[in-house]
Regions:
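Glycine/small-residue-rich phosphate/adenosyl-binding loop
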Residues: 61-143
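Short alpha-helical scaffolding segments that buttress acidic/His motifs in well-ordered protein cores
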Residues: 25, 47-51, 188
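Short acidic N-proximal helix/loop "leader" segments that mark the beginning
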Residues: 1-46
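A glycine-rich helix N-cap at a beta->alpha junction
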Residues: 85-94, 177-200
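Small-aliphatic-rich amphipathic alpha-helix that forms the alpha element of a beta-alpha
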Residues: 47, 51-52, 116, 124-175
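Short secondary-structure boundary segments
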Residues: 120, 166, 192
Length: 242
């Protein structure tokens, strides 16, 4: 019991430490503009260690990280992006919005000093992974948690990450020689950013606005508001405290 209490005390974070975490979450951005400076290996290893400490279903740890440095390979992936991106632009019916879409920089494949493909080995731990059978995609969700850990750690190191989703992931998997049963989850550009925006780029340019949290919280069933957990109610309770 004493050892357990000591452990709990060690896990108590100061107000300053808590604020650092929240600041990281609020300031994280999807980066597209990169400086060419390489990431020091010891820094990159720390970032990947953070990813590797993510929670995973049944402690499956389904992730792998393919570091892509080959200019030829990255040029092939850039060509895939350009093909898909042109098709996506044509899907935007409104002409002014299509023009806005075409003006956006949505990748840093060649500019960033490193690309990383994050994969999910869906065979790992087979034939039985504790907790996965009822929801088979929990291995994919686990890999996404590793990506979030990686992103926040990178942000803490002053490093930017950009997730490139405008790709044919099946073609990328073949380019990377990935075996059957291993799925590409994220293709990331990573490096020191030329800038950190105050707000997400898509919010700044007017593509989308951040939704109000109050409208996203329900109680007991879909669509039923949770009046006691709104900004207004919490602020009112704080003001009433002596």
């Amino acid at each position: 019991m004493t050892e357990r209490l000591v452990d709990l005390m060690d896990r108590t974070f100061s107000a300053t430490e808590r604020e650092v975490i929240y600041r990281l979450i609020r300031s994280r951005r999807d980066i597209r503009q990169f400086a060419p400076d390489p990431i020091p290996p010891e820094t990159l290893l720390r970032v990947l260690e953070a990813a590797h400490h993510a929670p995973s279903v049944g402690f499956m740890q389904p992730w792998n990280f393919i570091l892509i440095t080959s200019p030829r390979l990255r040029a092939q992936i850039k060509a895939l992006f350009e093909e898909i991106n042109e098709g996506e632009a044509h899907r935007v019916a409104d002409q002014s919005r299509q023009q806005l879409y075409r003006s956006l920089k949505l990748e840093g494949l060649m500019e960033s000093p490193l690309n990383i493909a994050v994969t999910c080995d869906r065979r790992r731990g087979a034939p039985f992974v504790l907790g996965r059978t009822p929801v088979p995609d929990t291995d994919v969700y686990s890999t996404c948690l590793a990506i979030q850990n990686m992103w926040l750690a990178a942000c803490a190191e002053g490093i930017g990450i950009g997730w490139v989703s405008i790709l044919d992931y099946g073609k990328v998997e073949r380019l990377l020689g990935m075996p059957a049963g291993v799925q590409l989850i994220a293709y990331l550009c990573i490096g020191f950013p030329r800038e950190f925006r105050a707000r997400p780029m898509l919010e700044e340019v007017g593509w989308r606005s951040r939704m109000q949290l109050d409208g996203l919280i329900f109680q007991d069933c879909w669509g039923q508001p949770c009046p006691w957990l709104s900004r207004e109610s919490v602020a009112s309770d704080e003001n009433e405290q002596p």
